[in-house]
Amino acid sequence: MTKQQANWSPYDNNGGTCVAVAGADYCVIAADTRMSTGYNILTRDYSKIIKLADKCVMASSGFQADVRALQKVLASRHLIYQHQHNKQMSCPAMGQLLSNTLYYKRFFPYYSFNVLGGLDSEGKGCVFTYDAVGSYERVGYSSQGSGSTLIMPFLDNQLKSPSPLLLPAQDAVTPLSEAEAIDLVKTCFASATERDIYTGDRLEIVILNASGIRREEMELRKD
């Protein structure tokens, strides 16, 4: 007689993909709206993007219960900051806060993989990419989530500066115009949904520039 062993994990991976691209005066952040577990789609209309400040937006994939808890912590700490300083956090400051928050939980981490994007104090686009325990870097572009292994090689091919080095450093911003960056992001997701079953349904795109924040959407594969 075989003995069955109970197996329970505090984590799940709800899939999904996030992409961010920074330009000279803009930032584009995009994510699909599919949330799934295993081979089951839980919902086709779940936004992975949240506005943290007037010039700062975060997109997250991974375990969405942990993501929601992380979002609440960041929102409450940003509210305290506003009461103490009478102003909103800058995007680089929010980037440091997110790193500290993730690192604080490193022994039982938030199972979330985040990209933070927005405009810095000079009006330049900025993108910060993270691992699950708070290690982060400012880059010109990044992707997180189940489709990132498909999208990052494509972004490297299109955007990484030519260099004789094997792994050249990224520039802090990309040379693309805002319209070119949006088209590139749409192409990335259209390709990724062909190969990644955890990415699909609908693409949500958030564009930040000096005029403010606007949103665009695009339909993706639903199978």
From Swiss-Prot:
| Location relative to the cell | Cytoplasm; Nucleus
BP-aspect Gene Ontology terms: proteolysis involved in protein catabolic process
Q: Per its UniProt record, what SUPFAM superfamilies does this chain match? A: N-terminal nucleophile aminohydrolases (Ntn hydrolases)
Q: Does the keyword Cytoplasm apply?
A: yes
- Subunit notes for this chain? The 26S proteasome consists of a 20S proteasome core and two 19S regulatory subunits. The 20S proteasome core is composed of 28 subunits that are arranged in four stacked rings, resulting in a barrel-shaped structure. The two end rings are each formed by seven alpha subunits, and the two central rings are each formed by seven beta subunits. The catalytic chamber with the active sites is on the inside of the barrel.
Q: Which family does it belong to?
A: Belongs to the peptidase T1B family.
Name the Gene3D superfamilies for this protein: Glutamine Phosphoribosylpyrophosphate, subunit 1, domain 1 (3.60.20.10)
Gene encoding the protein: PBF1
Q: What does this protein do?
A: Non-catalytic component of the proteasome, a multicatalytic proteinase complex which is characterized by its ability to cleave peptides with Arg, Phe, Tyr, Leu, and Glu adjacent to the leaving group at neutral or slightly basic pH. The proteasome has an ATP-dependent proteolytic activity.
Signal sequence coordinates: none
Task: Tell me the PROSITE patterns matching this sequence.
Answer: PROTEASOME_BETA_1, PROTEASOME_BETA_2
What does the entry list under GO cellular component? cytoplasm; nucleus; proteasome core complex, beta-subunit complex
Q: Please report the name of this protein according to its UniProt entry.
A: Proteasome subunit beta type-1
Instruction: Name the CDD domains for this protein.
Output: proteasome_beta_type_1
Query: Domain of life, per the record?
Result: Eukaryota
What keywords would UniProt list here? Answer: Cytoplasm, Nucleus, Proteasome
